[in-house]
From Swiss-Prot:
GO molecular function: DNA binding
The protein, known as: Sugar fermentation stimulation protein homolog
Family designation: Belongs to the SfsA family.
Species assigned in the record: Citrifermentans bemidjiense (strain ATCC BAA-1014 / DSM 16622 / JCM 12645 / Bem)
InterPro entries: SfsA (IPR005224), SfsA_C (IPR040452), SfsA_N (IPR041465)
């Protein structure tokens, strides 16, 4: 999918209060940008990193700039957690994610579980398929790791996906790696061992674990290929 244009390049000064980041643009202007990512952004929120911001045309937004990309270890990384659902939908429709082809309808944010909303609900003659997407930005030694902070929400989603399988439905946990230097995907056991245990339990109980890597450029983010999952 195409990124909003133009994007404004700058240098990260600091990220704070989870959703805010101060950035010095290349013209010397310092702006406070919205950060659409609730994780720790380990390795991606270091002062001095080069970043790309979009800018909303809305006159009512307190922070019109939004942080879209960061350059980490020489690689552009997509940090916007609103993109994975859109990327997954696009890749399902164009056949990139072949494991999820053949469904007649895709709906988003459908209520399920205990007060949750599934990212994507696929339906067709083969039944229902519940798809939970996760944005991955952390890479160590060529392996993409999730989560980058303890994720009670992620743990809850795995339990709910297992329940969907018990009810006779198909359930998929889909990791979207928004950087090109990840060659495989693994749970970040050192960061959230409970999540790692639940991910393995989910896989053993019928939840399908998929990982796809995105090609990230200054103008576009698109899923390009599946990655092996190391459990």
């Amino acid at each position: 999918m195409k990124l909003p244009q133009p994007l404004f390049q700058g240098t990260l000064i600091r990220r704070y209060q989870r959703f805010l980041a101060d950035v010095e643009l290349d013209d010397g202007t310092v702006v406070t940008a919205h950060t659409p990512n609730t994780g720790s952004m380990m390795g991606c929120a270091c002062p001095g990193n080069r970043v790309l911001l979009s800018k909303s045309a809305s006159l009512t937004r307190k922070y019109p700039h939004s942080w879209e990309l960061v350059q980490a270890d020489g690689t552009w990384v997509g940090i916007n957690t609103q993109l994975p659902n859109l990327l997954a939908r696009e890749a399902i429709l164009d056949g990139t994610i072949s494991e999820l082809s053949g469904y007649q309808q895709i709906r988003g944010e459908v209520p399920y579980g205990s007060g949750s909303r599934i990212d994507l609900l696929l339906s067709g003659e083969q039944g229902l398929c519940y798809v939970e997407t996760k944005n991955v930005t952390l890479v160590e030694d060529g392996v993409a790791l999730f989560p980058d902070a303890v994720s009670a929400r992620g743990q809850k989603h795995l339990r709910e996906l297992m329940e969907m399988v018990r009810q006779g439905h198909r359930a998929v946990n889909l990791f979207i790696v928004q950087r090109a230097d990840g060659a495989a995907l693994a749970p970040a056991d050192a960061i959230d061992p409970v999540y790692g245990r639940l991910l393995r339990e989910a896989a053993q109980n019928g939840v399908e674990i998929l990982a796809y890597r995105a090609e990230v450029t200054r103008t576009e983010v698109r899923l390009e290929r599946a990655l092996p999952v190391l459990l």
